[in-house]
């Protein structure tokens, strides 16, 4: 069944400005700017008032309405990112061979050494806007911080996938780097 008009309103908080032009949404806030294109969807993105963004789709099927809700959620995540930011923590888990990590001084990349006793060095470059850090008082913990939820979580996935156990029983070999905590950066 097709609905004639489906509409979703996204409220804009104070200190945040949003510009929408030709399905490209740019969100500016106190922590930075995020720009994302939604050209793949036939959605009308309008800003009728200063505190509201209106998303509309005409003659939409169920899947197209789901895309509309996904775009609304992404815009809400962008607003939350430029106001509060995102912070993910990753734990280094090992049984016998301790994993050694070296974070670049600017936090843009990480080197992982001695995973399962291998001599190979794994280098992972962080996506734009993501800062990797390690505190000495928190042993075997990495912290990834940024304003774009997609980039922060994708960088976590790249780090996790670089340390997967291959050709062994994963129930026995639990070594790796895993996400242990996801939160907003301001909530500490």
Curated annotation (Swiss-Prot):
Pfam families: Ribosomal_L6. One of its GO terms (biological process) is cytoplasmic translation. The keyword Ribonucleoprotein applies. GO terms for cellular component: cytosolic large ribosomal subunit. InterPro entries: Ribosomal_uL6-like, Ribosomal_uL6-like_a/b-dom_sf, Ribosomal_uL6_a/b-dom, Ribosomal_uL6_CS2. Keywords: Ribonucleoprotein, Ribosomal protein. GO terms for molecular function: rRNA binding; structural constituent of ribosome. It comes from the Eukaryota. Belongs to the universal ribosomal protein uL6 family. PANTHER family: 60S RIBOSOMAL PROTEIN L9, 60S/50S RIBOSOMAL PROTEIN L6/L9. This is Large ribosomal subunit protein uL6.
